[in-house]
Amino acid sequence: MPIKTQNDLPAKEILENENIFVMDEFRALHQDMRPLQVLILNNMPVKQDTELQLLRALSNTPLQVDVTFMNTKTHVSLNTPASHLNKFYTTFDEIKDRTFDGLIVTGAPVEDNTYEEVDYWEETCKILDWAETHVTSTLHICWAAQAGFYHYYGINKRQLTQKLFGVYEHKVSNRKIPLVRGFDDIFMAPHSRHTETPSEAIHACKDLTILAESEKAGVFLAIAEEGKKIFVAGHPEYDRYTLNNEYHRDLDKGLPIQIPYNYYPNDDPEQRPLLQWRSHCNNLYSNWLNYYVYQTTPYSFINTAEIIGK
């Protein structure tokens, strides 16, 4: 799938070197097709890494995708240059009158705080409420999934005794839903978090359908309102070295951290980490774009998006 990005976004050159089809703005204007409009609310500290990971994950269908990056106005990023944000990011006030085919809300390393203690919590809630009427399908990742469970259904998170950190085995529990079409019975996915939304509370919520879960990591994938809301408890978008970088970051800071589970061959951090989850990540995002973004966006919604976007 061609991903449309700003011409000089740093991730563009990296993706092209990986043989991923990235389309610049000039070429996209000369194609006779409507791209899917996907908004990404990027709450991760090093935003460039997440940009690359998500653009890579979105690049595996024949659909053209026009990505808009957004950051919260109420939080000052300490790990991403202001020049990068000013050039490549928008804010909610600038896009709130538009409609989008899809919205991705990323995770954030704030799970040790209560939701109300997060400085951009009110703004996040406003964006989630806005998405109810302005977005066809919203994909919530990791902390955003926990935040969504809390905001929509009142299900709070709980602290883990030890960080859930590594690559875990998951089982598909409902094959009738297109989001897991093409998944193996058992698949792997990374996790990196200190909290969890209790599996029993998710199971008890009648509005939620669980699609995949893990004995060690709990519920991984859930869906609501026929795909208008999708919740991913882990980080399938992570690249090969993300957990490695987090592990060494915490070691350098003197923080208590265990070797990532099921990640290094023989649990040896000197060895190259195994990449065991990429194909299912691609499958997940491809299914989301096809079945819940492209095929479910009503014609009237498309026209509204085109008119407002002019």
Which residues are covered by each model-predicted region?
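Amide-donor transfer/coupling interface in amidating biosynthetic enzymes
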Residues: 1-71, 95, 99, 165-167, ...
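Short, solvent-exposed polar/charged micro-motifs at secondary-structure junctions
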Residues: 76-82, 222, 310
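Short beta-alpha junction loops
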Residues: 71-76, 144-145
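Glycine-rich, highly charged phosphate/nucleotide-binding loops
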Residues: 80-99
